[in-house]
Amino acid sequence: MNLLTEFISNLPAPEAAKIAQIPLRGVQEEVWNALQLQIKSKNYNKDAITDELKISQAHFDKIISELLLKCYKCLCPDEGISLLDFLAKRSFYHKHFYHELKRQIKHAQKTLANEALGQFYKSAMNLIHRNMLIMHKDIEQIKALGEAYVKLAPKEEQKDATLLVKCRLIYTQIDYEFAAGNIKAKEELFTKRLNTELVLHNTSNEEIVYEYFLTRIYFFHGLEQFYNVLKIVDEATLALQRFDTALKRTFIKKLLFKKSEALYYMSRFDKKKVS
């Protein structure tokens, strides 16, 4: 099944109805109609379409790519990070995300100045981190985007950029072990890494301060050491007090949620012990 067929097959009805209105003509329209019939019958056969329309495999693939881009444009008019965000938030479209990421990187490299390109790499890295299911997180891609981001970061932001990327990588590795049920066996390893690889600087901005502590919170949450979660939340809240920004206030609210979450789990475990 090609990317276009997968994309159409997993669209909600309102969006499927919307892309059905895309104006097409010629061979594009013929390929589109043939694909729609195969989707309805759930009988996917590329050769059947190329033979019927008498087009080459390469021509078919080119048309599929063109039609997929038209679907993207219909549902998400803005390209770049907006389109990647649209795909990243839908678990069915992880393959589409990584495929489109390659295209968007090439486009960004040709059109963006260094500062904007660095922010593009950072945003793409964050999309994978925040929106992808763990089974779909490509740590090598996170690493590559992170390295590209750090390389283009202004000199005064190099320390923060480097720390953010390290947080992303360690968080993802913790995520892998947590999902595999191995996190408790790796407690000593990750404790050492958190204490040696993640160094918070006194000049770090509020985003980096938050992400630094969030990585630690996630680790202790995975270990079910909720008393340590509460301790780290308090440390993070104190560290953020020197800032007076809307972003800081957003982070404080998120930390309060983490605190409430930890207290909830602690109360559940206490009840189990009593019973």
Regions found by a protein language model. Give the residues of each.
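Flexible inter-repeat linkers and adjacent short helices
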Residues: 1-189
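Residue at a conserved register position within TPR or TPR-like alpha-solenoid repeats
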Residues: 177, 220, 263-265
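Extended alpha-solenoid helical-repeat scaffolds
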Residues: 217-219, 225-226, 239-242, 247-251, ...
